Amino acid sequence: MAAHLSYGRVNLNVLREAVRRELREFLDKCAGSKAIVWDEYLTGPFGLIAQYSLLKEHEVEKMFTLKGSRLPAADVKNIIFLVRPRLELMDIIAENVLSEDRRGPTRDFHILFVPRRSLLCEQRLKDLGVLGSFIHREEYSLDLIPFDGDLLSMESEGAFKECYLEGDQTSLYHAAKGLMTLQALYGTIPQIFGKGECARQVANMMVRMKREFTGSQNSVFPVFDNLLLLDRNVDLLTPLASQLTYEGLIDEIYGIQNSYVKLPPEKFAPKKQGGGSGGKDLPTEAKKLQLNSAEELYAEIRDKNFNAVGSVLSKKAKIISAAFEERHNAKTVGEIKQFVSQLPHMQAARGSLANHTSIAELIKDVTTSEDFFDKLTVEQEFMSGIDTDKVNSYIEDCIAQKHPLIKVLRLVCLQSVCNSGLKQKVLDYYRREILQTYGYEHILTLNNLEKAGLLKAQTGGRNNYPTIRKTLRLWMDDVNEQNPTDISYVYSGYAPLSVRLAQLLSRPGWRSIEEVLRILPGPHFEERQPLPTGLQKKRQPGENRVTLVFFLGGVTFAEIAALRFLSQLEDGGTEYVIATTKLMNGNSWIEALMEKPF
């Protein structure tokens, strides 16, 4: 059992066990020794559900990455392809199967589509002449993956682009399916609130799916009180700004994939006697660390503003140092025994402290640089409404010095969003400069950003952002980063719009912000799901509500930190569980919208 998944009000181990059981059942259908051929993208998410030990218990002897031509030799009875339903992957699978058939003794082939079977893919396999080779063709509905005790993600990398650019609702269907699975395990969610076009569609799909399952009455006592469905395009601003929490900065600088981060190895080299680390013994392979709340220290610092992390680390260092000094005071056998029993925990704490001190040093090298400061200053000026309507000299300099294109696009999009679109001549100027400097092939990327609403010309000459900013208190001048009193600490002044909507829904309710809700894109709505008699929830005095916030189109670690902050408020009244189509940051978001024609 993954202990860190069961610490919150909602025990997410129940979900993890359900998906593990489904996987075990499929593996047992394929009797005998097995090799799994993985769609490489799935190995990370699967690692959070089932370690190799579980697969081994069910006779999985070999694992390969899906690649063209022949499969590596493996003396096994079954070959299982575990893949997303993508047409290009079907071509590779067909190549693998045909080359195996020519190789000699027959194997049993099976295919497991994640998260859904696809008629198009099966037709492609048929056209390639291999569909009949598969004994089992099934689907594994891994819609929502538990990442932490309050965090679920579909890890659907193309969800935002599919929904907002291509009009493809597949990921919305998977989101609705995932929510139905949650309700089967944790009870019907009595109230659904939503904002945005995609939110409306997911709610409609859920109602339709519920009608189809009318025969099976859900008799599970509800754990969640509310579901809030939020479209990413209701708040395009937040992911574009630089996250300033510890976890957010790790993701911005190094990228967190499936709760793992890869870091420069030299910072983690063991120190040699006499200080310094040995030159020729320096490790060359990236240091890979898992980041979740199973690690006590990480759970404590992950959601803090980075400026508050240093003092926590130095306090921890003193406590650990004092604990190790205790060994000199251990005189009796009993005292020595007690010290020895605590040693493994103390050594783990010391290792954890060393790792996070190194990570904090790496981050500090970036955050104390002149360029980081200049970029942050410009971002904060835009978010507080300063000089958003004219060409920005810092952005001009970045283009002239050919800074990474993603950085430039993030800033231009941020300026556009904070001005409800750019004046036509400002937009034309940026567009011309970007294409001349970075290449005309990027016209496709700029078109995508315009389609998504991230970059646009101001229509009607009206800037709605100041109204939204004031009504929702999105900019706070005096932020206490050490002991925050408001969610704006996660961006050192800017309160994420998405999280402010969740906060206001909880108290005093959205009626207080009707005017702003009408300005923001998409409908807002409320649905009630009737509960069977006897399952109505009677809350105890002082017991908090539990709200599931589902971000359709992606969520950042800073937004997650802000929701956790609200959960921990003594008089907050609501605890939050977060679900999303994808964990993302501004860079990965813009990158997913970039076209690579060559």
From Swiss-Prot:
SUPFAM superfamilies in the record: Sec1/munc18-like (SM) proteins
Superkingdom assignment: Eukaryota
Coiled coil: none
CC terms in the record's Gene Ontology section: AP-3 adaptor complex; autophagosome; clathrin complex; clathrin-coated vesicle; CORVET complex; early endosome; HOPS complex; late endosome membrane
Membrane topology, record value: Peripheral membrane protein
Pfam families: Sec1
GO biological process, any: endosome to lysosome transport
Keyword set, alphabetical order: Autophagy, Cytoplasmic vesicle, Endosome, Lysosome, Membrane, Protein transport, Transport
Chief location category: cytoplasm
Compartments it resides in: Cytoplasmic vesicle; Late endosome membrane; Lysosome membrane; Early endosome
Cystine residue pairs: none
Annotated function: Plays a role in vesicle-mediated protein trafficking to lysosomal compartments including the endocytic membrane transport and autophagic pathways. Believed to act as a core component of the putative HOPS and CORVET endosomal tethering complexes which are proposed to be involved in the Rab5-to-Rab7 endosome conversion probably implicating MON1A/B, and via binding SNAREs and SNARE complexes to mediate tethering and docking events during SNARE-mediated membrane fusion.
Record family assignment: Belongs to the STXBP/unc-18/SEC1 family.
Alphabetized PANTHER family for the sequence: VESICLE PROTEIN SORTING-ASSOCIATED
Disease the record associates with this protein: Defects in Vps33a are the cause of the buff mutant which exhibits hypopigmentation in the coat and eyes, due to reduced size and number of melanosomes in their cells. In addition, mice are prone to prolonged bleeding, due to a platelet-storage pool defect.
Oligomeric and partner information: Core component of at least two putative endosomal tethering complexes, the homotypic fusion and vacuole protein sorting (HOPS) complex and the class C core vacuole/endosome tethering (CORVET) complex. Their common core is composed of the class C Vps proteins VPS11, VPS16, VPS18 and VPS33A, which in HOPS further associates with VPS39 and VPS41 and in CORVET with VPS8 and TGFBRAP1. Interacts with RAB5C. Interacts with UVRAG, STX17, MON1A and MON1B. Associates with adaptor protein complex 3 (AP-3) and clathrin. Interacts with PLEKHM1.
Protein name: Vacuolar protein sorting-associated protein 33A
Species of origin: Mus musculus
Higher taxonomy: Eukaryota, Metazoa, Chordata, Craniata, Vertebrata
Gene symbol of the encoding locus: Vps33a
